[in-house]
Structure formats: structure tokens, C-alpha cells
């Protein structure tokens, strides 16, 4: 029977000083000896996805206390990728993921916590906490801040338009849109607290924690503003105490993150990710989490899943034939359990999985899938939680309900396998001489007319150079924009390329150009945007050898990407570089913190994790 980790500080005469400090921080004498649950919050006023989380920590802590354990709350950092986008701040986004993982580890290990509950939400916070959970392998539950409501703007001509953050970025460079309309779009694109309203990185990852079995049903889709989310926080607090007692009092190791997050669970997570056309960043983060779990899982495994799973849902920034769906629409369609149910009925899930709330997948779907299960009235009520359509930065500020659910499996937000948007899933891994170790593309956001594409390269040594060329109208239809030295080492920090892709879209080039990079893309990216080229340029990848005018061929159906230059010429170019792989004429200030990250960073095919063996 495992002993409570906290016994190290709660028992024995020699630890009187530690207990004195615990009493000073508010722990009552009667509570010393109970399980200590670390409550990892991520409240910050910088990020709309986190600005409402201050009271959430208290709600979760009160539920933990009532269930018989001792909550101890602390905060991690949280970077807003949207605010950091388009300038040097984006260099810090991906490295913050690993810093968050470390900070959670430091707090849990330093204070001998017995279990962990992670209150996350936005782009790097959920992945960082997921890495920490897999690293620590103590009982853990995730509960996120929830999605933002979709925006709605009335334009000057009276047109009412539903929108999100990406519209505010791409429309800003569309010269046909007036300044007044741009202001209205800006003012209404992000109307509430919560993670941005589409299937961008934050919401993708929060949905995937459901499939990995580490969060409760509804975690990825209940809106941040809805009162139903408060009940979710309370349930999460109770659940983490339940699984903590199962582990320490019943020796039940099945509740540990590595027992839940098995290869089968990762396969199911990728199946859902591919079916819903999630952010390409999810691939990066799942690979990193698998590495922390000491689980052999790589791009080849992901590619195998992508070959058999169709695209069943298209949520912004992906556009469905009938219009654009948002996270509130996913929720109305039954949330992640409904999408899992469709995959299960299609024979596309591994059934040998469990979660923090259900012992089997069958139990999970029976209780929560509104399409094929037999959910309770309370579960059905959860899926009726609707947007309030009122600007608010406050959690639990509204309790609107949908009159009906979207159960249309043929033409609704979530389709069945028979009516899939495409037989190919929403994400794909490409390989070829330009990316020997692989690269990724969000096929759900690519017009099928350009799934095969060939064009001349326009080489950019940085994201900034690419933006300048796009805005100066130097990019022509048919071009392949190549942005290199933006990988984990080369950036350093592997910047997101939302501005270049959004500006291509705003210039009307989104369906007639391609973009290839060793950097990465925002979950809000659409178009033929291929990222994570590995090895990256700074590690001597072929992308470092590309020259202006070289032809590049992209073939999504056959999962290939080729630089149409013969091997002898590439060898000559490599010899000319003389082992120096660095950008030309790039003026960029790189801090000591970023240099430290770059010294250990691996390429994207390994999740851009740090390899401490590089330290010697």
C-alpha cells in the first residue's frame, strides 16, 4: 500500500518546523495527515482564457476540502499567444510550456503533494501541465477555464457576421474592408472570457484531455461564461479526492496518469484530433506528453491513425459547407462524447481504455453520448448549455439553454462516419526529402483543390521577412513561401505563423499559395500551411538548403513533400554551408533564457522537448 507522499512533512518530531509553516498558511491541526492536493491554477489578467480563473481555484479548493483532503493552491504563468503573436514575444510561447511543466513539478515535489488538479485553459498551459502530470505520475485531474463565446458584429451595411479572433487578424489586411468595419470586428471578435471560440490549440487540447481520460465530460466544450461550468469545477474537486483515496487507501494504480494515458488512449486522442481537425500544435504537445510518460509514440504512429480516421467535424477556422461552427456548436451537438461515439460506432477507437470518471469506454459512452448512449437527464441538461450573447469577462455569468440539441449526423456540426466531410482526417503527416523526419498539415483547413500543389519557393529567413514580402505584395499566386530558422532551436522557440497565413488569406492568396516552415502554426491557421518541418534548418534539415525558385511538390493524398532538386546539387549546397546552419541577415535579440532553451531543444518530430543529454 503506497504511503501518502505528504507524510514526509506531516509526520515525525523532526518535521515540526514544516508543520509550523503549514499551520501558518492556514492548515488546521485536524487536517494535518489528510491527503494534500496541489491546485495548479493559471489565473492571469493578461489572457482572456485565464482572467476568470481566480475564483475557480477557490471553488475547486472548497470541493476538495469538503471531500476530506487539504487543497493547496498555487499559480503558474500563462502566455497569451494572440497578444504575443507577430513580434518577438512569440519566441517565448513554446518555451513557456516546458517552464510551466517544470514549475508544477517544482511545487509538487518541494511540498510533497499527494495529488494534483490542473486548472488550465490556453495554448501552452494545458500541454505544460499535461507534461507535468505524466512526469510526476500522481493522481491528477484536469479542468479547464472553458471556451469563449463566438463573436457577432453588425457591420456598417447592416450585415450581421459571426466571427472570432482570426477574422480580426486576416480582415485587417483586406483593403476592401473599411476602417469602421475593422473596428467593429475588433470590438466584437472576442466578446467574453474563455479560450478563443474555434477549434484552435487551446480548445483542441482541452478536448483531448477528455479523450486521454484525465478530465470530466464537457471539459472541452462547456462555455466559460455558463453556470454549468461551476458544477464541473466542483465535480473535478471531488473526483481528484476520490482517485487519490483509491490510490493511497486501496493501492489502485489504475488512477495514475500513466495508467490512464496508455498507447491506446493516445491513439484515441489522435483519432479524435484528426476527426475534428484540431490544431497541428496538438501533435507537438501529444508527442511531448508521451515523452514525459516514457511512452514510445511518434509521427509514424500518428500517420497510421490519420490514414484510417475520416474528418467528422469542421470547426473554425475550418469552414463547413453550411457555414462556420464554433465550440458552442460542438457542445450543442453533444460535445466530445458525441464525437467519440461516432468514432466508436465506426470501429475507430481502441476500447481498452478508462478514465478518472469511468472504468470502461462503454460506461463512458453510455453515460455521456447523447446520440448512442443512455445518458441521465442531468447529462442531457449539460449539453443544452448555450451562449449568453452578452459581453462578459466573468465566469458563470449566464445560464442560457439551447431549445434543442444538434443531433444531425448527416449534416450537423458532428457527422457520422457515413457522412464524413472527407475520408482523410483533418490532420496529416507528410514526409519526403524536404522533411525527412516529417512535417504536419491541418487538412481540414485546406481546400481540396490544392491537396496536390507544386510551385516555386520564395525563401524567407524569418517570419518577419515573410510578413514584409506578403504585405509588399511580392508573393504571387502559385508560390510556396518557405520560412526557415524558426524551429525550436533556430528561432529559438518555434514561433507560430498565424500572421503570415492570415495575411495571405487577407490578400486573397489563401487558396492559391502554400507555406512551408520549420516553425509552427496557430490553431487558427487555415490554408495549405505545412509546419514542423524536421529536421529544422538550424539542425541541418533540407529546408536550410532551399533557394528561391526551387520547385516544391506537395501531395497530401500520398503524404509526401519533395524539394525537386537533385541529390548532387543538394550535397553541393550543404558543403558550401560548411556546417554553419544560421539565418542570413536576421537581426534578432535572443535572451539568455531563450538561448538556454535552444541549447537543449529537439526538432518538432520529438515534440520540441528538451534533451538534457545535450548538456554533456
Curated annotation (Swiss-Prot):
It comes from the Bacteria. The active site is at residue 522. One of its GO terms (biological process) is L-valine biosynthetic process. Pathway: Amino-acid biosynthesis; L-isoleucine biosynthesis; L-isoleucine from 2-oxobutanoate: step 3/4; Amino-acid biosynthesis; L-valine biosynthesis; L-valine from pyruvate: step 3/4. Binds 1 [2Fe-2S] cluster per subunit. This cluster acts as a Lewis acid cofactor. Pfam families: ILV_EDD_C, ILVD_EDD_N. Belongs to the IlvD/Edd family. Functions in the biosynthesis of branched-chain amino acids. Catalyzes the dehydration of (2R,3R)-2,3-dihydroxy-3-methylpentanoate (2,3-dihydroxy-3-methylvalerate) into 2-oxo-3-methylpentanoate (2-oxo-3-methylvalerate) and of (2R)-2,3-dihydroxy-3-methylbutanoate (2,3-dihydroxyisovalerate) into 2-oxo-3-methylbutanoate (2-oxoisovalerate), the penultimate precursor to L-isoleucine and L-valine, respectively. This is Dihydroxy-acid dehydratase. The gene is ilvD.
Amino acid at each position: 500500500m503506497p504511503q501518502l507522499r505528504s507524510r514526509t512533512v506531516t509526520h515525525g518530531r523532526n518535521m515540526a518546523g514544516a508543520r509550523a509553516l503549514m499551520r501558518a498558511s492556514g492548515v488546521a491541526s485536524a487536517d494535518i495527515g489528510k491527503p494534500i492536493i496541489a491546485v495548479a491554477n493559471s489565473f492571469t489578467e493578461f489572457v482572456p482564457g485565464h482572467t476568470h480563473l481566480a475564483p475557480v481555484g477557490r471553488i475547486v479548493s472548497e470541493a476538495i476540502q469538503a471531500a476530506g483532503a487539504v487543497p493547496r493552491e498555487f499559480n503558474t504563468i500563462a502566455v497569451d499567444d494572440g497578444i504575443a503573436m507577430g513580434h518577438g514575444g512569440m519566441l517565448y510561447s513554446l518555451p513557456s510550456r516546458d517552464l510551466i511543466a517544470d514549475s508544477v513539478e517544482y511545487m509538487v515535489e518541494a511540498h510533497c503533494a499527494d495529488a494534483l488538479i490542473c486548472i488550465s485553459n490556453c495554448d501552452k498551459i494545458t500541454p505544460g501541465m499535461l507534461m507535468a502530470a505524466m512526469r510526476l505520475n500522481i493522481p491528477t485531474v484536469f479542468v479547464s477555464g472553458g471556451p469563449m463565446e463566438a463573436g457577432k458584429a453588425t457591420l456598417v451595411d447592416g450585415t450581421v457576421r459571426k466571427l472570432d479572433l482570426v477574422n480580426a487578424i486576416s480582415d485587417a489586411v483586406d483593403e476592401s474592408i473599411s476602417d469602421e468595419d475593422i473596428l467593429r470586428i475588433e470590438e466584437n471578435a472576442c466578446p467574453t472570457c474563455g479560450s478563443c471560440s474555434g477549434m484552435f490549440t487551446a480548445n483542441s487540447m482541452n478536448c483531448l484531455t477528455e479523450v486521454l481520460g484525465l478530465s470530466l465530460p464537457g471539459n472541452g466544450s462547456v462555455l466559460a461564461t455558463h453556470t454549468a461550468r461551476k458544477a464541473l469545477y466542483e465535480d473535478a474537486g471531488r473526483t481528484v479526492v476520490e482517485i487519490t483515496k483509491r490510490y493511497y487507501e486501496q493501492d489502485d494504480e489504475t488512477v495514475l496518469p500513466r495508467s490512464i494515458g496508455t498507447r491506446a488512449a493516445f491513439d484515441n486522442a489522435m483519432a479524435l484530433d484528426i476527426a475534428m481537425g484540431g490544431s497541428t500544435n496538438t501533435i507537438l504537445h501529444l508527442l511531448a506528453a508521451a515523452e514525459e510518460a516514457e511512452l514510445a509514440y511518434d509521427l509514424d504512429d500518428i500517420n497510421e491513425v490519420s490514414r484510417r480516421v475520416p474528418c467528422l467535424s469542421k470547426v473554425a477556422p475550418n469552414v463547413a459547407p453550411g457555414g462556420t461552427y464554433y465550440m458552442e456548436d460542438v457542445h450543442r451537438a453533444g460535445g466530445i462524447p458525441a464525437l467519440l461515439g461516432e468514432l466508436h460506432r465506426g470501429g475507430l477507437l481502441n476500447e481498452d481504455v478508462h478514465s478518472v470518471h469511468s472504468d470502461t469506454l462503454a460506461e463512458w459512452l453510455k453515460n455521456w453520448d447523447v446520440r448512442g448512449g443512455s445518458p441521465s437527464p442531468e447529462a442531457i441538461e449539460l449539453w443544452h448549455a448555450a451562449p449568453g450573447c452578452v459581453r462578459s469577462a466573468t465566469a458563470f455569468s449566464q445560464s442560457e439553454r439551447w431549445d434543442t440539441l444538434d443531433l444531425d449526423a448527416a449534416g450537423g456540426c458532428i457527422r457520422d462516419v457515413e457522412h464524413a466531410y472527407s475520408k482523410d482526417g483533418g490532420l496529416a503527416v507528410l514526409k519526403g526529402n524536404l522533411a525527412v523526419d516529417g512535417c504536419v498539415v491541418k487538412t481540414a483547413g485546406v481546400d481540396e483543390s490544392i491537396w496536390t500543389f507544386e510551385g516555386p519557393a520564395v525563401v524567407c529567413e524569418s517570419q518577419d521577412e515573410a510578413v514584409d514580402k506578403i504585405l509588399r505584395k511580392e508573393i504571387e499566386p502559385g508560390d510556396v513561401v518557405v520560412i526557415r530558422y524558426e524551429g525550436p532551436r533556430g528561432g529559438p522557440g518555434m514561433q507560430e505563423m498565424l500572421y503570415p497565413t492570415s495575411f495571405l488569406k487577407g490578400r486573397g492568396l489563401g487558396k492559391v499559395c502554400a507555406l512551408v516552415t520549420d516553425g509552427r502554426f496557430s490553431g487558427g491557421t487555415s490554408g495549405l500551411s505545412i509546419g514542423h518541418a524536421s529536421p529544422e534548418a538550424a539542425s541541418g534539415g533540407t529546408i536550410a538548403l532551399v533557394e528561391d525558385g526551387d520547385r516544391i511538390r506537395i501531395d497530401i493524398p500520398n503524404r509526401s513533400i519533395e524539394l525537386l532538386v537533385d541529390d548532387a546539387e543538394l550535397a553541393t549546397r550543404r558543403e558550401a554551408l560548411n556546417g554553419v546552419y544560421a539565418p542570413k541577415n536576421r537581426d534578432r535579440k535572443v535572451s539568455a533564457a531563450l538561448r538556454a532553451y535552444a541549447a537543449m531543444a529537439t526538432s518538432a518530430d520529438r515534440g520540441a522537448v528538451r534533451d538534457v543529454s545535450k548538456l554533456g
